[in-house]
Curated annotation (Swiss-Prot):
Catalyzes the deamination of 5-methylthioadenosine and S-adenosyl-L-homocysteine into 5-methylthioinosine and S-inosyl-L-homocysteine, respectively. Is also able to deaminate adenosine. This is 5-methylthioadenosine/S-adenosylhomocysteine deaminase 2. The keyword Nuclease does not apply. It comes from Archaeoglobus fulgidus (strain ATCC 49558 / DSM 4304 / JCM 9628 / NBRC 100126 / VC-16). Keywords: Hydrolase, Metal-binding, Zinc. The gene is mtaD2.
């Protein structure tokens, strides 16, 4: 008998949807077939879509507190407004903001996310309580100050070492310097060395705007990716957020170094940043995941919604990709970027699985993959082999309480 069985669903496997059942034991998928033996827990998925959970490859979860704040501004002006409010954040605020994000993500089919922010102990606690999976790092920026650099690295390393493997392995950690324009070359080198010494991943914002490209070129005489490569920062343990404004030479560097990209199409549109060359990156062999960025720069944390926006933008560029490719980026692309064996309905993979029902919004299903773009409220969610949402109701979290506490916190934060 299996620990858990998802039975008779239409399962997303190798880019297509096929009828099958999924057996889970411990935190792994152990059996994928038309017929599997009974499970201690049985989920009837007849008429439903079953797919690996989505991985939000770049976000700042607690920024749900700033959803709808500083609307209508380009990135630099938006950052100035947001940083002013973020300076008032404390552990309690970040906890409730992250809990709200976890509720939203689970209900939209996201089982795991990568987060770089502040007060990260609170983020880790929220992840643990919600039942989600996450890769977490303290967002570091030295701004050319040696003393600040020392303190930032100390905080980042302390957090990474404390929480790596937390909550039975659902939390893993990384080092997360903010960007080439907020971190000095010396600091980035130290972070890169620490990453190699300790075995931590690295995550950084890169080439989000043309302003950033211009700023880095003026400082260092190189484009951002070329600059990072020149100091030895780029390798297969590196994930770049955004990567909108890349030259062909830079894309080749990413492919050669095994760097992954977290594509954030909605955020890039909202902040007037630009449209990333996703099709070209994939053609060159670069692994791409999909991120929402924070709710303040997106308004939602639905990876499937971002996949839809990303697909439409590449269509606009004349570089169309099939819906199945976008689902692969939304799932396995993120897990692969962060060195996790997940994002596939396949034996031996992490049992992070979501189930979507058929509704008036996604019927008829001529192409189930395309229909997931428009119907992205999950019915059931399994993370690490554990049922964390059943019939749309979260198992570990009081949703109404989280919404109430997050709203109270947000109003206090912005002085409402």
């Amino acid at each position: 008998m299996h620990d858990l069985v998802i039975r008779n669903g239409l399962c997303f496997i190798n880019g297509e949807f096929v009828e099958c059942s999924v057996g889970v034991d411990g935190n792994r998928i152990t059996h994928v077939a038309k017929e599997v033996e009974r499970g201690e827990i049985e989920i009837d998925a007849a008429g439903c879509l079953v797919m690996p959970g989505c991985f939000n490859a770049h976000t700042h979860a607690a920024m749900t507190l700033l959803r709808g704040y500083a609307e209508g501004l380009p990135l630099r002006e938006w950052l100035e407004k947001v940083w002013e409010v973020e300076a008032r954040l404390d552990e309690d605020a970040v906890y409730w903001g992250t809990m709200l994000a976890c509720v939203e993500m689970l209900k939209s089919g996201v089982t795991a996310f990568a987060d770089m922010y502040i007060h990260m102990d609170a983020v880790a606690e929220a992840v643990g309580e919600s039942g989600m999976r996450a890769v977490l790092g303290y967002g570091m920026a030295d701004r050319g100050d040696e003393e600040r650099a020392r303190k930032e690295l100390e905080i980042g390393l302390e957090f990474a070492e404390k929480w790596n493997g937390g909550f039975e392995g659902r939390v893993t950690t990384m080092l997360a310097p903010h960007a080439p324009y907020t971190c000095s070359p010396e600091f980035l080198k130290v972070v890169s060395d620490a990453s190699k010494d300790k075995g931590f991943l690295k995550h950084i914002h890169v080439s989000e705007t043309l302003w950033e490209v211009k700023e880095v070129r003026e400082r260092y005489g190189k484009r951002p990716v070329e600059f990072l490569d020149s100091i030895g920062f780029l390798d297969s343990s590196t994930v770049l957020a955004h990567a909108v404004w890349l030259s062909e030479a830079e894309m080749k560097i990413l492919a050669e170094r095994g760097v992954s990209v977290a594509h954030c199409p909605t955020s890039n549109l909202k902040l007037s940043s630009g449209i990333a060359k996703v099709s070209e990156l994939l053609e060159m062999g670069v692994n791409v995941g999909i991120g929402t960025d924070g709710a303040a720069s997106n308004n939602m944390l639905s990876v499937l919604s971002d996949a839809r926006v990303g697909a439409l933008l590449q269509n606009l560029r004349g570089r169309t990709l099939k819906p199945g490719h976008w689902l692969e980026m939304a799932t396995e692309g993120g897990y692969r970027a962060y060195n996790l064996k997940g994002g596939r309905i396949e034996e031996g993979y992490l049992a992070d699985i979501v189930v979507f029902s058929k509704t008036c919004r996604n019927a008829p299903m001529h192409d189930p993959a395309a229909m997931l773009y428009v119907e992205n409220q999950a019915l059931h969610a399994v993370v690490d082999g554990v049922l964390v949402m059943e019939d749309g109701i979260l198992v570990n979290v009081e949703e109404e309480k989280v919404i109430e506490k997050a709203e109270e916190t947000a109003l206090e934060l912005v002085g409402g």
